[in-house]
Amino acid sequence: MKRTWIKNARIVNEGKIFHGSIVIENEVIAEVLAEETVPSQPCGEIIDAKGYYLMPGVIDDHVHFRDPGLTHKADIHTESTAAAAGGVTSFMDMPNTTPQTTTLEALNAKFADAATKSIVNYSFYFGATNTNADVLPTLDKSRVCGVKLFMGASTGNMLVDRMEVLRKVFANAGMLIAAHCEEQSIISANTTAFKEKYGEDPDIKYHPQIRSAEACAYSSSLAIRLAKENNARLHILHISTAQELDLLEDKPLSEKKITAEACVSHLYFYDKDYETLKGRIKCNPSIKTSEDRNALRKALSTNLIDVIGTDHAPHLLKEKEGGALKAVSGMPMIQFSLVAIMELVCEGILSIEQLVQKMCHAPAELYHIERRGYIRPGYQADLVLVNPDHEWTVTADCVLSKCGWTPMEGQKFHTRVEKTFVNGDLVYSDNKVDQSHRGQELRFKR
């Protein structure tokens, strides 16, 4: 039996910070000990946490690992490597791959592939289309994290735009619907208008005016209405506007059937950053005004925003060239998501307890993940150790995503991920990832 004692830690868990230690027995947390209490049995390995923060591993509910079919940009192995280095111990991957994850055959193939490739834990969304709503009730709710619904066209063109199909999806899903909310008719009209005024590829600075706040608010409002009409479980992804926050309820997660995610990109950048980063920060929905960013940041200290995800979506740098219409949308983010939000903690925008709630606890509760997301005896030992006082600057040579770049290059951070544990195994330490480790399928108790 393998027993590991992580001692001298500042444990951040369930709204509290306390000095203590954790005993890992094989894959699970066996003991959570306060202060100077010693383990009940001898431990073969002892790790001194040096007073650093020890928290549950981050659960990222929103990634695009591009596998299968787009593996020149990324793949499950490379991106799970980046995840481990960033303190992310579990991910949920989106269906806009090639082939799209819109059939049971494609879904099962992704699970089988991840079992051989992924360093961290994993699950996959099933993609709704205009033609597969009848398949949704047959999905294995204990295995599939949710149904992804594109209510706005984005990378992969999986737009569901027929009202009768939308109603059927909300009625038939039987599990969480994760929705990309942008109204396509508004985007199309804006595209036509900006092309007429500025040519075939308007400057990147016009991206947030083409994929506008109005498009987001209209679509999110429609999704909420459909969810309420069908008593469905709706999770609105990547909220990017102050207007959308007005549609949400500020009450505990346990009391809501409609929840919301904010992404690191919309919390970190704003429209002025297009001047320097240009297409590198082009994403859908677009990064908008400083007022929108500030509203999202303020919402982190409330229950309006339930989860912080990444929308990690790698592309090659050459694919990011061009303006508002030719540069592709999406950026890598998973390796630096935790330290980026820790930077907001350092700035007093949210507390570290709130960070752990929105990046660790809430995804586990919201998706009903079995035995993960908390530091509790009997739970899987998915953990991250964070140095709260280490200044460093992101350089290109530290990027582990296959695409080889990050919009965070040149950013100065003041905290650092020191170690990451997945199912009790130390998978990241001393700037190295254990490439031989394999994660597990997430299981859902529904």
Protein language model regions, located:
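Histidine-rich, glycine-flanked metal-binding segment
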Residues: 1-5, 10-56
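C-terminal cap of metal-dependent C-N hydrolases
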Residues: 9, 323, 377-443
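Metal-associated gating/positioning segment near the N- to mid-region
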Residues: 50-117
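Short, acidic/polar
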Residues: 73-80, 130-139, 222
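A glycine-rich helix N-cap at a beta->alpha junction
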Residues: 112-128
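His/Asp/Glu-enriched, well-ordered alpha-helical/loop segment
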Residues: 201-222, 226-231, 301-308, 313-389
